Amino acid sequence: MSVVINEKRRSLLQAASSVGLLMGSGLASEAIAATTKQDPWKQAQAIIDRFAKPIHFRKEDFLVTSYGAKTCDVKPVEAWVSFVERKTLQTPVADATDCYPAIAAAIAACHAAGGGRVVIPAGNWYVAGPIVLLSNVNVHLNAGAHVYFSNNPADYAKYGKYDCGKNGKLSMTRWEGNDCLNFSSMVYAYGQRNIALTGDDWTAILDGQAGVNFADSPYCWWSWKGREKPSSVGDIAPGSGDWIKHQKGETEVSLNPLNPVSLAEVAPHLSEEKRLFIQGEGDKWRRDSNYLRALAEAGIAADKRVFGLGHFLRPHMVQFINCSNVLFQGYQVTNTPFWQHNPVGCRNVHVKNIYANSVGPNSDGFDPESCNYVLIEDSTFDTGDDCIAVDAGKGPDVQYGPSQNIVVQNCKMHSGHGAMTFGSIMSAGIQNVFAQNLVFENSHWKTDPLNIAIRFKCNMSRGGFLKNLHIRNISIPNGIRTTPAFYATLPGSVIPTKSVATSAGAVITIDCGYDPLSDNVRTRPPVVSDIHISNVNVGNVDTGAGQFSSYQAIVVLGPVPSDYNGPASPAPKIVPVKNVTISDCDLGNPVNKENPMYLFNVKDLVLKNVRVGGTVYNKTLSV
């Protein structure tokens, strides 16, 4: 049973039936197992206090110029700066010195000496390969240092640890929650400790050049997204009918003929029934983005999941895997091929005063994945996807455990899909996360509005849990997107297509049926509980049709039982979203005045002093 809360039909609320109790997860961390009764914000302060003492590095600088690095001249180039906008940027001239060898040598020398700073001075620098950090090294950009990374994919398949023949020399990476051998990220580290990426200020720039066309090609890194012409409101700037084109067959969502015609070729251990279950109907599973998921579901080892050259999975800008004592501070990243930052399985990660500035496709700002003890503060995000998304692996790839003990504070978000997001890549679970004192500016609300302010997303494929999440003191002066967007539902779903605006339009969205058509294997029901949100204040903007803050105020789509496609016996328990509290909030004036909220499969949603339009809610809802 679902309910859209309609002020003309309040009787629906009294008639809403209660549902079964939510089971706890068996993956709770020792750090928080006994803390449910104490003030959760004391837990947050304890996490913050862990970072009071900075990471120590030896007091020795290694200038990259001492190892042969030379600045380069730049020339103007017309390039994409978003999916629908081009501008004149700068790019290195054709004969620019490649500083990759010099930077790699400086890092090696610094590491061998016991650590210190590898310094990139002011100027323009061309780097045709990844900057790979080693333990006890701080790579530091002086003010005015602009590092232009090569936009040639082959340069990120030249130096990796794994020689994969025609696919290149690849690195162990993680792509949307699944491990694989692929292009290195532009800044990379694996298994290191005491490392830092720092700058003097936001004029210290790491530039991925993702919107600059490949040599002798009309396509760029962002073309690999394979996105068709957008049609929804806010996707195309006024007066523009242009968007990034792509070569047919050369995208992450194209059927790749290099991928086998049957999983039997790479996973002969699978029964035919299991193989067909993972593949699903047709050949869509042979698209690179789907093929990686299929390999993971089939139990193929990570070092046998080979992509790189001939494939189209874009690299991250910064990806550190299985590292500890990590600092990101005082620089800007821009024009990134894929996610801007993705620490995976890292411990003690401090993010301070960075500018994540890339609005291309999938340009998430900062995505800590299966990380323990993270502080993100005093930073600004302008993104083409989620500003911050807390993740925790996908499907079987949960070896790094949950994301937990994370604080986000004193940050500003301009545009993106979700300002503060949890999931959907969360198979290992997300718990004990605190977000406070944030401004979701939505400064581009006329042309590129923020889709959702506070977003929780999961589904029957990713599973996992969301619990003990606390959010307070959020200012959203320019509202969010005021038109709805939807995900297609599965055939036979109890949720009619285009009936629940979980893709865009609600200030607070808990979506347990996220994009269900994208996954063939849907056997892991998510568990969502103990979410507490307070003091969220949303402004209205003049849309021409009136003063509005959003399309709806709150959407809670609990797990949809009909999405499950696993065995009937034994079947996992599918339980409602439980114990969500929203208090002391003014969510503005939603466009959908008749139905300002939507609820499905939720137990104990507590509203305390929550103003929506002209109504103040004080009630507990179970639907």
Question: Language-model segments: which ranges?
Answer:
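Asp-box/BNR beta-propeller blade signature and adjacent active/binding-site loops
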Residues: 66, 80, 100, 104, ...
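Alpha-helix capping and helix-loop boundary segments enriched in small/acidic/polar residues
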Residues: 93-97, 342, 363, 367, ...
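Short, T/G/N/S-enriched strand-turn elements that build extracellular solenoid repeat scaffolds
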Residues: 107-109, 127-134, 339-345, 378, ...
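Short glycine/acidic-rich loop motifs that flank beta-strands on beta-rich extracellular proteins
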Residues: 115, 127-130, 150-152, 209-212, ...
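Short, recurring structural edge motifs at helix starts
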Residues: 125, 363-365, 395-398, 421-424, ...
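Right-handed parallel beta-helix
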Residues: 143-144, 193-204, 324-334, 347-358, ...
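Beta-rich accessory regions
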Residues: 460, 465, 472-485, 489-506, ...
